[in-house]
A protein has these predicted regions:
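Membrane-interface "cap" regions at the ends of multi-pass membrane proteins
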Residues: 1-16, 43-67, 73-77, 228-232, ...
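Membrane-embedded translocation segments of transport machinery
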Residues: 155, 159-303, 327-328
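Select transmembrane alpha-helical segments in multipass membrane proteins
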Residues: 1-5, 29-33, 71-84, 133-136, ...
Length: 431
């Protein structure tokens, strides 16, 4: 499980999305609430989801039916649809990582001109053939891993490449922090400015908490179903939350000081990391090799996370319709490709096609991170804390078991405090 957590933690969520959201939502007024939410609410909901999967021993729909009865099955369907939507836009970013890896291999990974940075990213994201082609390649690789059951091989490789990516991040952070003007980036990330706080920044921090931990759609529930009997779930969940939170902070430290050092726009949007990293590589000895290694590891990290998400939908088709894993993976991937096609075009031909100010990519991200993932975890909390609590507590009572008082506090957080907080932030963020 720790290997799973490491590949989820040090991936696109930390390196791509967290710096973008931090830059677009006021820096510290997003970062600090995220850390608090992740270590509290995130831990509670992650523990609930993994434990329910451990108890249910099946896909999210199977688990909901087995533990709660037929009236809980629609919640499982919500998770399946959420997984499809997440992978639809996530695969666009996965395609970008492959494209930047190809550029690095061809010796085009170093850029010092701001104009060239924007032009290169625009040429990739705005070209329909490139954007859709790389996305399709990324999804094909993902489907191949799931269909061919080579996930164990991927996890073994994770033991090498994920620590390698972590080390590369540390090197890039050190170099970025030595750049003139980098201190402005640190101040932006960690200096609390009350006047900059908005409910929207808290709303986005809540959404990223769910996104970064992959909770609310059944992804971690599916992985929980694979845990052997007697697993120490609480310890694993604490490690997952700790690693994920730390990786996100490191991702911001890797990007934001360089953004301010080179006078880039911190609110540049989803492409922020991709227009920043080539500048940092250009400041390093053997920068071209660093670029290849970084984007190779990042591509692998993106792939392992996408395998987790596709596994969710594949497991649903296998359990509910008794198809083979190969058939389930192919069907899921084709559906994702159809939706993902429009997500990929959201930075090119469909960039100006918007509804309420959002394009297709934005809507898929918004509906999942800020709506369906929080709602999914509210349902998980009610199921765990009210319907199956005695068995839920038993599953967590692996020696050394927590005290009775700990369980009382945990249950209070699970069914009262955390749901109330989620509802308040959801309502205020949507208004």
């Amino acid at each position: 499980m720790v290997v799973v957590s490491l590949k989820e933690a040090v991936g696109l969520g930390a390196i791509w999305k967290f710096p973008w959201l931090a830059g677009s939502n006021g820096g510290a007024v997003f970062v600090i609430p995220y850390v608090i939410l992740s270590l509290t609410l995130g831990f509670v909901f992650l523990t609930a989801e993994i434990t329910l999967g451990y108890m249910g021993r099946g896909s999210i729909v199977t688990t909901m039916r087995k533990l709660g009865g037929s009236k809980w099955v629609p919640a499982g369907y919500l998770g399946v649809v959420t997984g499809l939507l997440v992978l639809s836009f996530y695969s666009v970013i996965g395609g970008w990582t492959i494209a930047y890896l190809v550029d690095a291999i061809l010796g085009r990974g170093l850029v010092t001109s701001q104009a060239e940075l924007g032009a290169r990213f625009g040429a990739l994201s705005g070209d329909p053939l490139l954007a859709v082609g790389y996305q399709a390649l990324f999804l094909t690789l993902t489907a191949g891993v799931v269909a061919l059951k080579v996930s164990k091989g991927i996890e073994r490789l994770s033991r090498i490449l994920m620590p390698a990516l972590f080390i590369l991040m540390l090197i890039l952070i050190v170099r970025g922090l030595t750049l003139p003007g980098a201190s402005e980036g640190l101040s932006y990330l960690f200096a609390w400015k009350p006047e900059a706080f908005t409910w929207q920044s808290l709303y986005q921090a809540l959404g990223f908490t769910f996104f970064s931990l992959c909770v609310g759609c059944g992804c971690m529930m599916t992985y929980g179903s694979y845990l052997p009997q007697g697993s120490r779930i609480l310890k694993s969940c604490a490690q997952i939350v700790g690693l994920t939170t730390a990786a996100s902070i490191l991702g911001a430290l890797m990007v934001m000081p360089a953004v301010f050092a080179f006078h880039l726009d911190p609110a540049a949007g989803p492409g922020l990391t991709f227009v920043t990293m080539p500048v940092i590589f250009a400041q390093l000895p053997f920068g071209g090799l660093f670029a290849v290694a970084f984007f190779a590891c990042l591509t692998f990290a993106a792939l392992t996370s996408s395998v987790s998400m596709l596994e969710l939908d594949t497991a649903f088709l296998v359990d509910e319709f008794h198809v083979s894993r190969t058939t389930g993976a192919i069907i899921s991937t084709l559906v994702i490709m159809v939706i993902g096609f429009f997500c990929a075009l959201s930075f090119g031909p469909l960039a100006d096609t918007k509804f309420l100010g959002k394009n297709v990519f934005d809507w898929c991200d918004f509906l999942t991170s800020n709506i369906s993932l929080p709602i999914g975890d509210l349902i998980v909390a009610l199921l765990a804390g009210l319907v199956v609590w005695p068995k839920f507590r038993e599953a967590l009572s692996v020696p050394p078991a927590p005290s009775d008082q700990w369980f009382r506090i945990f249950r209070l957080l699970l069914v009262v405090a955390c749901p109330i907080l989620v509802v308040i932030v959801l309502v205020t963020g949507l208004l």
